Regions:
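Conserved S-adenosyl-L-methionine
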Residues: 24-28
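Beta1/beta-strand and adjacent pyrophosphate-binding region of the FAD-binding site
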Residues: 2-11, 31
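Conserved N-terminal/central alpha/beta ligand/cofactor-binding core
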Residues: 38-42, 46-162
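Conserved small/polar residues in nucleotide/adenosyl-binding loops
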Residues: 181-188
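N-terminal Rossmann-fold NAD(P) dinucleotide-binding loop
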Residues: 14
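A conserved short coil-to-beta-strand element within the FAD-binding core of flavoproteins
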Residues: 168-179
């Protein structure tokens, strides 16, 4: 297998990297290797009745697979430099916010339209916090909700699946340098 770009992991970083490559350099041959399952196969066996605790699956569907650990979350996306990461330290605060808004636009395009964008800036709650010597960090937060978050991921996968080669259930163990311009990824194929 030879690819121009190999992405390890199909969490948000991997998904949006693949997305951007399909838009900016559609002629590149791109592969995404993911230790977990594709989205539709991600199911945790814990049902609360027969199975009440973790059974130690080879690939934890809660934590890994297409969409990453947040695939089944309530779909809150923070648009802020005040917490949650340090991207702004590398590219600047305005550029970081612009990228976060760009990702938000993509989420809206792929199924999140109509969801609410909340903000703490200029709210009565912020005023009350300040009056009581509490510092409320400013943020805009897009709340997709669990169901819409899943739909956005389904739609992104539908867009990507014909443009990128996905290898699910394929954890990468090591990456070695072959030459100045080439790397080799070593995989462990899981028998499922």
């Amino acid at each position: 297998m030879r690819y121009d770009v190999i992405i390890i992991g199909a969490g948000p970083g991997g998904i949006f990297s693949a997305y951007e490559l399909t838009k900016q350099a559609p002629d590149l041959k791109v592969a995404v290797f993911e230790a977990g399952h594709e989205l539709k196969r991600r199911k945790c066996p814990i049902d609360g009745t027969k199975i009440k605790s973790c059974v130690g699956c080879d690939s934890c569907s809660v934590m890994s697979g297409f969409g990453g650990a947040g695939a089944f979350s309530d779909g809150k996306y923070n648009i802020t430099n005040d917490f949650g990461g340090s991207l702004y330290e590398y590219i600047g605060k305005n550029e970081a916010i612009d990228l976060m808004k760009y990702v938000d636009d993509i989420n809206m395009e792929y199924g999140g339209e109509g969801t609410k964008l909340y903000s703490t800036a200029g709210t009565r709650f912020k005023t009350v916090c300040l009056q009581n010597r509490l510092h409320l960090l400013d943020a805009s937060v897009r709340h997709l909700g669990t169901d819409i978050n899943y739909i956005v991921l389904e739609n992104l996968y539908a867009y990507l699946q014909d443009k990128v080669e996905f290898y699910f259930d394929t954890p990468i163990q090591t990456v070695e340098t072959v030459s100045y311009t080439h790397l080799r990824a070593h995989e462990t194929l899981m028998n499922l």
